[in-house]
Amino acid sequence: YADRILLYGPPGTGKTYAAATNKVGYTLEGEPNVYQITMTEDTASANLEGFYKPNSSGSFEWHDGIAIQAWRRGGRLVVNEIDHASPDAMTFLHAILDDKDIAQLTLNNDNKETVRPAKGFTVIATTNSLPESLPMALKDRFPVKINVDKIHPKALDMFPKSWHGVINDTSLSDDIETRISIRAWRE
């Protein structure tokens, strides 16, 4: 099965919605097993890997970052706007996105714990850019790339049926001046 998928396409087509809500991301008990983060130039690798945080006794405890939580639990990591990741975060993402048969990381915690992805771990990343515009080292880590050029039907269902035509027309408009993302319709 595909364990690393890149969803790309215009803003507002429901890429993140599709990545985060598909039932494949649920445990057998029906609990969500989806971990989501949006990349920015300010996102540090610690957000993905983990960090020390003071506890109630005044000492510091290690807290796994979102990517390591997903790794340990065999969850789905949704990386929104992956092309906006800081160089620090991108370096960490390269390791997370290695083939699961060879992937392993040594954490920066006190005992330098080595972790590997649990069975079921997947990554779905989103971008508004074409895959060809991504750095080769990133692009090559996604064996599956899907163009999402239409609004996700379930995302559209959040609105009254009478609005669907107008939302489709404005969200998918070729005119950048009149395009409105589906996210803007919810606000």
Briefly describe each language-model feature range.
Residues 156-187:
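Conserved AAA+ ATPase small/helical "lid" subdomain
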Residues 1-162:
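AAA+ P-loop NTPase catalytic core and its hallmark functional loops
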